[in-house]
Curated annotation (Swiss-Prot):
It comes from Bos taurus. PANTHER family: LARGE RIBOSOMAL SUBUNIT PROTEIN ML48, MITOCHONDRIAL RIBOSOMAL PROTEIN L48. This is Large ribosomal subunit protein mL48. Belongs to the mitochondrion-specific ribosomal protein mL48 family. Component of the mitochondrial ribosome large subunit (39S) which comprises a 16S rRNA and about 50 distinct proteins. Interacts with OXA1L. It comes from the Eukaryota.
Length: 212
């Protein structure tokens, strides 16, 4: 009986020494015994430096940094392309209507059509809105009364390098798809067309004239 008890004590002491030796080996190698094979101890200390949810919900590292906005400079006049015997120079496609949404939509259609047909589009812009008052003469008397106010919207699609042989086909396409109520006109680009893009400021011009 004493011999069997001695063997059990020896085995128990042997396992304790092995566990202590493995713990000492983990400590000297810098390895955490809790998460290693054969670990026998549990620790209540936090193994992370911050909160468990630290970093969750961050998205700024996924978004590209925004580029600084460039200041809009003054629009300068470009050199006008005169054209050759085989192709037109700079042409302006004017679209005029009373409905702004219809004018804008058809201007986009013409722009996309030019891109599809490999026609170079220099730029697409809006002209200043024009208003016209309609006056009505009374049945009795010479006094004029305001009947309505008509607002005219204009969009311009500027193209260049249109082939002379293809020009007739191109104009026929945009004219056949012209919506009702939209006026179409195509003419060569001039310096007056460039100046007409901007609203006149007579007061500012007078002040500049006085300063100069």
């Amino acid at each position: 009986m004493n011999g069997a008890l001695g063997k059990v004590l020896c085995l128990k002491n042997d396992t304790i020494f092995k566990q202590a030796f493995s713990l000492l080996r983990f400590r000297t190698s810098g390895e955490n015994p809790v998460y290693s094979a054969g670990g026998i101890l549990l620790t209540t200390s936090r193994h992370y430096r911050s909160k468990p949810t630290h970093g969750i919900g961050r998205y700024k590292h996924l978004v590209k940094p925004e580029e600084p906005k460039k200041k809009k400079g003054k629009v300068e006049i470009r050199a006008i392309n005169v054209g050759t015997d085989y192709e037109y120079g700079t042409l302006n496609i004017h679209l005029i209507a009373y409905d702004m949404a219809l004018t804008e939509s058809y201007a986009q259609y013409v722009h996309n059509l030019c891109n599809h047909l490999s026609i170079k589009v220099e730029e697409s812009y809006a002209m200043p809105t024009k208003t016209m008052e309609v006056l009505q003469l009374q049945d009795q008397g010479n006094k004029m009364l305001l009947d309505s106010v008509l607002t005219t919207h204009e969009r311009v699609v500027q193209i260049s390098g249109l082939n002379a042989t293809f020009a007739e086909i191109f104009l026929e396409i945009i004219q056949s798809n012209l919506p009702e109520g939209v006026k179409l006109s195509v003419r060569e680009h001039t310096e007056e067309d460039f100046k007409g893009r901007f609203k006149a400021r007579p007061e500012l011009e007078e002040l500049l004239a006085k300063l100069n």
